[in-house]
Regions:
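Extreme N-terminal, non-catalytic leader segments
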Residues: 1-25
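P-loop (Walker A) phosphate-binding loop of NTP-binding proteins
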Residues: 31
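Conserved glycine(s) of the Walker
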Residues: 35
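Hydrophobic positions on the alpha1 helix immediately C-terminal to the Walker A/P-loop
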Residues: 39
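Post-Walker A helix-loop "phosphate-sensing" segment adjacent to the P-loop in P-loop NTPases
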Residues: 45-53
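Conserved nucleotide-sensing/catalytic segment adjacent to the nucleotide-binding pocket
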Residues: 51, 60, 64-112
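ATP-dependent NMP and nucleoside kinases share a basic, alpha-helical "lid"
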Residues: 114-168
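Small-molecule kinase domains that catalyze NTP-dependent phosphoryl transfer to phosphate-bearing small molecules
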Residues: 168-210
Length: 210
């Protein structure tokens, strides 16, 4: 299934799920690089009543992350459970449930590693769609979602595309994922454990192959 068909299918489901509901919160999970962000961008173009939320915007600062990473016994767990500010995201979700007023916060800056990008969320929208990894993890915010969508894809091809993209982005500064200290290596290990232990596809209300 291509991204356009996937977008249309999810859009129809959102209309169905949101019928007779004042507010709806939907989480989109899937392997890193499967196309969650692109899909959400396309959904917003199709449905103006969607409030898009990217989990990556809620990452902790790079300074805080490095302290956790340095002292961790198992660094993969940092990426799985502590990389994001779950309390901050939870507050946005809870406010969305009960308010329609603009909600202003500062989000993560991937370049500086600081929490300094101002962002305003339009809580008058009826459907909040949040995309990210580990979205259905029982130790995080899984219980807050009304509906769950899981995206499946060819992991080998996804990894191949991501590596090519990262090599192009970083050039001579590219850090191979096979290196023991590679951040992405830790993420991949955590993701594979998450899929094996918690079976996110089996928790989903809708599973799509893209």
């Amino acid at each position: 299934m291509d991204i356009r068909k996937t977008t249309n299918e999810i859009s129809k489901k959102l209309e169905e799920w949101s019928k007779d509901k004042p507010k709806l919160i939907v989480a989109i999970d899937g392997y890193t690089g499967v196309g969650k962000t692109t899909l959400l961008d396309n959904l917003v173009k199709l449905n103006p009543d969607i409030l898009p939320v990217n989990r990556d915007d809620f990452q902790i600062s790079r300074t805080k992350f490095k302290k956790l990473y340095k002292n961790a016994e198992d660094r993969t767990h940092i990426f799985e459970l502590e990389m994001n500010d779950s309390g901050k995201l939870k507050k946005l979700i809870q406010t969305f449930r009960k308010s329609s007023k603009p909600y202003k916060i500062k989000t993560y800056d991937g370049l500086s590693g600081k929490i300094n990008i101002p962002k305003t969320y339009n809580l008058s929208k009826r459907v909040m769609v949040i995309e990210g990894i580990f979205m259905f993890h029982p130790k995080l915010l899984n219980k807050l979602w009304d509906k769950r969508v899981y995206l499946k894809g060819d992991i080998k091809q996804i990894d191949k595309r991501r590596i090519a993209r990262e090599k192009k982005r970083w050039g001579k500064d590219y850090f191979p994922e096979t290196h023991p200290d590679s951040y992405f290596r830790q993420v991949i290990i955590a993701l594979k454990r998450y899929r094996k232990v918690y079976h996110p596809d089996k928790q989903a209300d809708l599973v799509l192959h893209i």
